[in-house]
UniProtKB/Swiss-Prot annotation:
Coiled-coil region: none
Lineage, uppermost ranks: Bacteria, Thermotogati, Deinococcota, Deinococci, Thermales
Residues that hold S-adenosyl-L-methionine according to the record: N28, L30, G54, E75, D99, N117
Name of the protein in its database record: Ribosomal RNA small subunit methyltransferase A
Annotated source species: Thermus thermophilus (strain ATCC 27634 / DSM 579 / HB8)
Keyword presence, Endoplasmic reticulum: no
HAMAP family in the record: 16SrRNA_methyltr_A
Amino acid sequence: MSKLASPQSVRALLERHGLFADKRFGQNFLVSEAHLRRIVEAARPFTGPVFEVGPGLGALTRALLEAGAEVTAIEKDLRLRPVLEETLSGLPVRLVFQDALLYPWEEVPQGSLLVANLPYHIATPLVTRLLKTGRFARLVFLVQKEVAERMTARPKTPAYGVLTLRVAHHAVAERLFDLPPGAFFPPPKVWSSLVRLTPTGALDDPGLFRLVEAAFGKRRKTLLNALAAAGYPKARVEEALRALGLPPRVRAEELDLEAFRRLREGLEGAV
């Protein structure tokens, strides 16, 4: 068993370095050996360089390296430098101490992979940006269960929204399994989920997502009223909805990605 695969060993390591898990960085360290193995298996095959965001104490990093991955680990918390240098000593890892949101993701090699226990507060903006780059072959990451549900939601459900459609536009999404709070130290207050995204190669479409964001900007309103409030000509929206066979009182959450694409075509040049 890894020396980082129990709450007791993690606590001892932190105490030895005079450290504590910092909520500002969303630090909940994975301490379940079984779940570490499952994450590594879900990420295979390692067909390109692996980027890990938020390596923490290095448990997942070490597991990936031992499985043959070429890993660049990006950590914002400079306090963890001596810990990672200890836990990953002698292993061929590239450590980068930087805010992951400021990393030049658009320059990573084509076919790269993300494998990470993501700091939950940056998960949505980071995953969105990585998908937009078009440079990743696979993204496998832990997030709050609620965020995983939003990424994989179906139309007409409360979790369905902009994030669902952003993910669906760029990738095939799978929620592989859930992890209880006890799989981490310190245990978070919520369950977590492992998500795997397999990009399809679709490029970013700013016009489509302006429409989607406007549609969900006033979720309680009808789609017609939400788009009118965002500046889309009401008569043009009514005409486009009729052409799609949609009732005037339809709401944004009832449309799947293809319906939004067709609606966008019908509204082309309306704003």
